[in-house]
Swiss-Prot record:
Keyword Cell membrane: yes
Keywords from the named record: Cell inner membrane, Cell membrane, Membrane, Sugar transport, Transmembrane, Transmembrane helix, Transport
Membrane topology annotation: Multi-pass membrane protein
CDD domains: TM_PBP1_transp_AraH_like
TM stretches of this protein: 35-55, 63-83, 88-108, 113-133, 138-158, 179-199, 204-224, 229-249, 275-295, 306-326
NCBIfam families listed in its UniProt record: PRK11285.1 (NF008441)
Source species, domain of life: Bacteria
Disulfide bonds: none
Organism this protein belongs to: Azospirillum brasilense
Protein name, as recorded: L-arabinose ABC transporter permease protein AraH
Record's subcellular location: Cell inner membrane
Record-level GO cellular component terms: plasma membrane
Amino acid sequence: MSQAMQPQRTSPSPDAAIAPARARGGVWQLINRSGIVMVFLVLFATLSLTVPDFLTPRNIQGLLLSVTLIGSIAVTMMFVLALGEVDLSVASIVAFSGVVASTLITATHSVVLGIAGGVLAGGAVGLVNGVLIARWRINSLIVTLAMMEVVRGLAFITSNGDAVMISEERFFDLGGGSFLGISYPIWSNIVGFVVFGFLLRKTVFGKNVLAVGGNGEAALLAGLPVMRIKITVFVLQGLVTGFAGVMLASRMSLGDPKTSVGLELGVISACVLGGVSLTGGVATISGVLVGVLIMGSVQDAMSLLNVPTFYQYLIRGGILLLAVLFDQYRRNQRRAMKI
């Protein structure tokens, strides 16, 4: 007649079930935001303690000056990668723009014309890249790999295979002058990071770039001008890289068609180390800045330690591989958080 009392079963609360996932997500977000900064701080502290003369004011200023070339191009490479594309032609654009600027200055003695010609030459290459990629829908890796060879060839043709010497001393002020004790190339980097950081995070254009990189088909269905956005980004990449080439020619006092070989790998490594996703849709200007400083610190330390060139290739390649692996790890974590 009496029934045995059954123990009452209680199902776990939904909030309790998702709490560990939220905790993991919070930890991952903290690592994702500050992890690369911690890596840089540990690296910088280690190099300061182990590498002679690394922390001297003169070397720090030299380090900042040495990363200006990578840094100036990384601010726009960030946009290219955020689209889910890539640009391997930047090193050739640097050489070509420097040669064009040097040739024009030597022929006309006009510094303004030379600078404008070099920058526009870079912009023209960027326009060709953008049209082929966005309008004709050719893979950006193939397009920019081909343009890397074409533009390098144009640099050799324009200079007849030799470096073009510059005699206009006014042109040297662009790369060698300073303001408030800080050289113009460093100032140009500061301006570049501020302007393009603002463009990425505070403007409709920047948000559209991230939207296109995150899901191009959805962006197209939402009415975004995907083709125009991609072409604009590649033109910006060309113009900024052209200016970087002109600045480098000013620092070297010549336009060299053989300069900056392999530069594109350093730029891409800095961006990926800084959290820019190779599949698009994710980018932060602060992360790119830290990535640039990491690349510069490693290169500076290798120079101070007189590391042989062939070992430097090995180390730079290893950094790029680690950056790609880290990017893959971040993507896996983002997928896990969405499940």
